[in-house]
Amino acid sequence: MLKFPRDLYSDVRVEDVAETTLVLEDGELKQCTESRRRGAFVRVYDGKRWYNSATTEPDRLQQELDTLAAMAEPNPAIGDDPVVRRFEVNRDCVLRWQAGDLRAVPVEQKLALLRSYQPLLERSGLAATRARYLDVHVDKTFCSSLGADIRQDYQHCGIALGYTVTGANAPFTNGRQRYASDFAGLQGCQEGLRAAIAEDVNYAMHAVPVEPGEYTCVLSPTVAGVFAHESFGHKSESDFMLGSETMRREWELGKRVGWEGLSILDSGVPNGSGYCPYDDEGTRARDTYLVKNGVLTGRLHSAATAAALDEAVTGNARAISFEFEPIVRMTSTWIAGGTDTFESLLRGAEGGLYIP
């Protein structure tokens, strides 16, 4: 049981991480690694500044806390600090992957799965092929001096196939991937990937340059997702706005940025690579509208950025790993569905371009 220092805010995040990386280059095994590591990130805040420490010795957490507290200035009114007031005090256990835990799958089975995809890269017209299997499982606990006590897990795995199409008018390098939250989700995807690779080869061999000009474009779901991520998601990460009046004016809430049917959301609730039921400050995930009916309506926040802009937390304080402090970053960002069909979108873009 940790003893949190008095008159200071503090929190501790402990992570157990397991990762697997397998790589085949032109069919030859080049990498086969499994790693397990356990570490923690400790924070202390006195109302003026943060004191941080990362350690791979979680049994020394009390010493880490005490060392950081000795550097800080005790603040009897720390509970009234605008940052501290925004911290949620959640107590929960969300262990979603006890069944289907990737750590329980032998590496031999993972390698056999990867090899089952290798024949897709052995067709004519492909060179410099690379097949990869990646997975990660994280078991994370978070506790704070305010009383937060959270345990959660997440995991994901994927197959990535990369290649260069030969014989094309110009070099064409591309790749296809499949993502899943458990090992079973990566099985049986060969035919879909085979068709996608054939589509790439056909494109590389027959594509012609686009005539310069202005076009109405219809974006595939993948491209639309990248568009939402890059054009709206990053600008909504509110740490970019601190100290920049230009960014605040450019991204002012209430500003119209699109058609009235456009809504873009961010949330850690949906299962996927952005799944994050609680962020790394213990804030519960929720749906946050970045754009609603074409109007900027929200931003993504940590407790510090929410306090600085006098807004509410959103569950987007995320750390790369236990070696890093949490910063404001997206979870899952997407464009909300509308009422148009694919065919009606194409009819409305006659003479335009479809971006697959």
Regions of interest found by a model, annotated:
Residues 1-356:
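N-terminal small-residue-enriched
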